[in-house]
């Protein structure tokens, strides 16, 4: 939805002062630009793999501000700001992460595709979701969430000294237009500090979509030399979607650590009900573990749904663990 200043006014009480001031300053250009407020609220009751009973986020909760300005000649300026939070407490999702943790980008979009600058998901994490029954979005049941990219952080230290998984700071992102179903995607980060001898981050993905089929081949390397390679294939016919993926990630060290993950998934749509199941086998330096996930969603509307999720981890060495829960998601 397109928002007026009146709609924004209550929001100013919770947004950082700088962001509110920036939106007010942009008011004179509101007629030429479209600003959209969207997001998702998710909360569930569940028992985790650590056997703790919790009320909290099972999927993700976020508030997003995005917009575009028509510059003429088929060219548009774009921006996106996404804040992630815990719906059960209202707190920022993880201590140490930036306020606009989900994304903070500005860019240009046209016949050439789209280029963005700032913070966003890298090329692998931004495109792998189509090959998991839960879209890599369920901490209980998703084989992707619990296994993919096991040894790979987009940056080992960019999260206030801790590892950053999935997102790049100071990044450049490019998505090509689709030509006969084919598209190319790139992400990279090249900024460094004086005396910093780290390398660059760069990733590339090739995707195809058509005739019910989707396929991807993607890879990325972070500034520490860690690598990830991802391959996925899915087919949708009628109410069924079948999918599979293979992921290989290597942590660069004096003795490298290699994780290999193969996953399979199925999704069946039955009116307002979606049934899901997935399996994954993970091998980390010869230590194997398999994972099984099952779940069901029921959609009350296009925006509101309830779900049930179950996941079980079965390592060859150590104890098995199960997680299960129910939840509700509302998008706007």
Report the location of each language-model feature.
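Outer membrane beta-barrel
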Residues: 33-47, 52-191, 198-200, 207-209
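Detector for outer-membrane/organellar transmembrane beta-barrel domains
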Residues: 199-293
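Transmembrane beta-barrel strands of outer-membrane/channel proteins
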Residues: 41-45, 81-83, 119, 186-188, ...
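Repeated loop/turn-to-beta-strand initiation elements of outer-membrane beta-barrel proteins
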Residues: 35, 74-77, 112-116, 181-184, ...
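Outer-membrane beta-barrel "beta-signal"
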Residues: 294, 320-332
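Cleavable N-terminal export/targeting peptides
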Residues: 1-34
